[in-house]
Amino acid sequence: MDENKQKALAAALGQIEKQFGKGSIMRLGDNRTMDVETISTGSLSLDIALGAGGLPMGRIVEVYGPESSGKTTLTLELIAAAQRVGKTCAFIDAEHALDPIYAKKLGVNIDELLVSQPDTGEQALEICDALARSGAIDVIVIDSVAALTPKAEIEGEMGDSHMGLQARMLSQAMRKLTGNLKQSNCMCIFINQIRMKIGVMFGNPETTTGGNALKFYASVRLDIRRTGSIKEGDEVVGNETRIKVVKNKIAAPFKQADTQILYGQGFNREGELVDLGVKHKLVEKAGAWYSYNGDKIGQGKANACKFLRENPAAAMALDTKLREMLLNPAELIVEEPILSEMPQEEEL
């Protein structure tokens, strides 16, 4: 670029920053735009599948799946992980179904968690937008999109038709929220439910509620499914769970994580450490015995998990080694939301 063009560009950049604030325009190679801050999901397998070590700050995330698949558990685990590193979290409980006792068991500090139980969908989204604009909140969870009922539907009669009302409400909210979340570096997680499309002969008949806007605006979309039961004798103590990364704007998508959710405990972290440790040769397995750093840690997986549970320093060291081995920052893709590509109201 010649000198006159450089001067003109510098003057234009200076004018833009003066008018709209510092950081309103920058070069893509600037380090500030390349760093993606993430928060652990509480599951090592999922953090690795996401490629960045967790879910990204300043972005919209969608978690969806069938009933009782672990959607709320996943978000509560993330809230607990965020609180452990000093983040402030809010939970907008549109379903009016949050169990504080269960949240506490998962490690959530319920005394510090902000909770709202809004009456209408518009109220829920306004509260979310106000929290994001405050700059004081780091993580907002909305449970769930299906329960965000428009005011007109609540005030109307049973049987009234409100075609596309919720989709229009969400589309408008996404346009407002995206910029505010980015500026305040606040993550917003939408929990969503599954519905069936009628008359689909080929392809997947499943879809999520609330129209297409959320699909476009979300930087990460997670599909969580229960694949089996975990039994101790005849008693079912948890679920085998598979989480697919359906969309990912910060690393390679379409990876999946197989994990276990234990009732009343959340993710089976020690089980993940043992399985991944054996797979990547950090934990040795000879017959039924497991060894770590040359020392036997248990006969059978249950005893190996018990050892790691009772020795958090060893568990943390193994977790750190696995993250260093399996998370490659060079693979990260930083893709900012492009407003011109977002769906407008007629595309709902």
Swiss-Prot record:
A molecular-function term among this protein's GO annotations: single-stranded DNA binding
UniProt GO BP: DNA recombination; DNA repair; SOS response
Thylakoid listed as a keyword: no
GO CC terms of this entry: cytosol
Domain of life: Bacteria
Keywords attached to this entry: ATP-binding, Cytoplasm, DNA damage, DNA recombination, DNA repair, DNA-binding, Nucleotide-binding, SOS response
Keyword hit for Transmembrane helix: no
Compartments, record wording: Cytoplasm
Residues involved in ATP binding: G65, P66, E67, S68, S69, G70, K71, T72
Role summary: Can catalyze the hydrolysis of ATP in the presence of single-stranded DNA, the ATP-dependent uptake of single-stranded DNA by duplex DNA, and the ATP-dependent hybridization of homologous single-stranded DNAs. It interacts with LexA causing its activation and leading to its autocatalytic cleavage.
Similarity comment: family membership: Belongs to the RecA family.
Alphabetized HAMAP family for the sequence: RecA (MF_00268)
The name this protein goes by in its record: Protein RecA
Organism per entry: Vibrio anguillarum (strain ATCC 68554 / 775)
Name of the gene: recA
